[in-house]
Amino acid sequence: MSINEQQLLKEEYYAEAVRYMNNAKENLAKAKKEGKFYHDKKYVRTACGIAYSGLLVALDGFLRLKDIKPKPKDRKSIEFYQSNITKIDKKMLDYLNSAYHILHLSGYYDGIENATVIKEGFDNAYKIIDKIKP
């Protein structure tokens, strides 16, 4: 892949990941934060799910830049991302694991309402997204 192709790929995946994150922030704002907690689980869950999806978009772009693709007909899982990221960037793996637990498990599935925890999940997602910033 040429440098120009890599740049175009970064721009495409970065823009899409940021679009997801902006949408997630809009949904989170609807959850009505009071003090250190959000008060509408529906919007918290939605926002966390969208933010996690944005993180996955960024990871897909990052792995494509490294010429890593899933096998045809295989569904990508957290294990796919973890096993490939661990070979490339251990710090990114820490951000991925943290964001996975906060955004996907605690936020999306459990509807955690603690604003500090959710912010940490969003921050970790942005650290991954910034890895493909053009």
Task: Annotate each PLM feature.
Residues M1-P134:
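Terminal alpha-helical segments
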